[in-house]
Every structure is written in structure tokens, then in C-alpha cells.
Amino acid sequence: RALAGLGNAVKGAVDVGVKAYDDYQNTKATEAYNLFQKAMNEKMYGENGIFIRQGEAAFDSTENMESALRDTAEEVSRQLKLNEYAREKLNRNIYQFSTRFMPKAMEYASEQRMKWADEQDRASLDLNFEGLLNNADDRHMRIMYLSTMEKTYNQYAERNGFSPAKKELGWKRVLSGAYSSLADKFITNGNLNAARELVNEDTLWLGGDQDRIRA
């Protein structure tokens, strides 16, 4: 009986020890994931973080996220000297984390590419519009600037998925606005004949722009 009691006591002590060890490893895995999340939050949202970068700096967001996930997991595992059980639990948590944030990084990179491209197109339209006005008296120069504006507008419209009707109307607005400003400049400079020539070309105008100049 004494030996049986001793055996039960030893078994009970072993069970308690196993449970304590399992709990310790579970807690180590939780600690590791806490450190992982803290480090990733800094890499994603801290100074110059993945989701803070703008424009061209954000084009590699997907690759940067992949590297950050891998490097951070290795750093945490090495820092805490996790055993196989704790590493497996950490890896499961990291996998769930990555299934949320990898697609987000891909989407962010795509959004930033489109935003950057749209900004370049708008800047091009503004610069060529300025060139058009600065060379108002040179017909060949005006044609050159307008041609560049049309190409730029077309690629902007295509990138943003404009329908043919929306694309046509949008370009008509750009063209009408450009010629309205051009006519205003002719009038201001006293070149009324040039202003009249523009007004008489019906294909250039949209809505009330033509009537405003005539008035």
C-alpha cells in the first residue's frame, strides 16, 4: 500500500509538472506573439512604416511585408529561445496574421501605384495647359501641347476605367476649358480676331463656355 501510495504521489507530481511545463510553453508562445505583433506594428505603422510610405516608396509594399514577417518571426524565436512546441504555436499565429496583412500590403501597393500615376498625369495636364497659354500665338506649339494633353488624358481615363462616353465627355471638358482660357488671354491681349476664330469652332466647346466668350 505504501508503495502504491508513493507511486500515485509520484504520478500526480509528474502530471502537475507536465501541466506546468505545458502552461509555461503556451505562455512563452503568447509572449512571443506579443513581441511579434509589437514589432510588426512598428514596421507597418511606425516612422516610414509599410503603410505610411507614399507614392513610389510604397510600390514594394508586398515584398517589404513578406520580408518583415519572415525577419520578425526569426528574431522573436531566436530572442526567446522557443522550443519546438512554442515555435509551432507561434508559427500558427503568424500564419493567421500574414493571411490578413499580405493581401492588405498588395492592395496598398496597387493603390499607391495608381495614385502616383494619376498625380503624374494631372501634373502633366497642368504643365501642358500652362505651356499652351504661354504659347498662345503659336499655332504649332498649341497643337503640340494639346496633343500631349490628349495622350495624357487618355491614359488617365484608361487607368481609371472610364467608359467611352465618360472618356469622351471628360476630354471635351478639358479641351473646352483650355480653349476658354486661351480665348480669355487673346481678349485680354486685344487679339479679338484670334478669340473669334476659337469661338467659331463649335467642336472645341462644351456647354456655356462658348456663350460666355461670345458675350
Identify what each model region corresponds to:
Residues R1-A215:
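Non-transmembrane, interaction-prone alpha-helical and coil segments associated with secretion
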